[in-house]
Amino acid sequence: KAYPQLELRFDVEDRLVDLVNEGVDLDIRIGDDIAPNLIARKLATNYRILCASPEFIAQHGAPKHLTDLSALPCLVIKERDHPFGVWQLRNKEGPHAIKVTGPLSSNHGEIVHQWCLDGQGIALR
């Protein structure tokens, strides 16, 4: 409202955008893959948690240890710059790379979120 002449177009992409050639003035990225020729500022820290529906927990039980995740159906989000199905987790012993699998995966977080709510598996959100 303070700038009524300003026009805004909000595009969501799962790819690296060529800011100059595509005429982009502002780019918000998730991750650490910032090209050295860009001026960047950290906006927030993205904390993640493991999620499952009450129905899923009732059927499969809750994992007691991070390694239990490998034997449970997990919902994998395909992220641009991360190995598929490898969750980087941390507990009191430190960081762990846990390989997970499951019947459903997507590159769209909201779809995985809905699957999780529907009791289809454990999600990292």
Show which residues each predicted segment covers:
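C-terminal regulatory
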Residues: 17, 21, 33-125
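Central regulatory/effector-binding core of bacterial HTH transcription factors
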Residues: 1-36
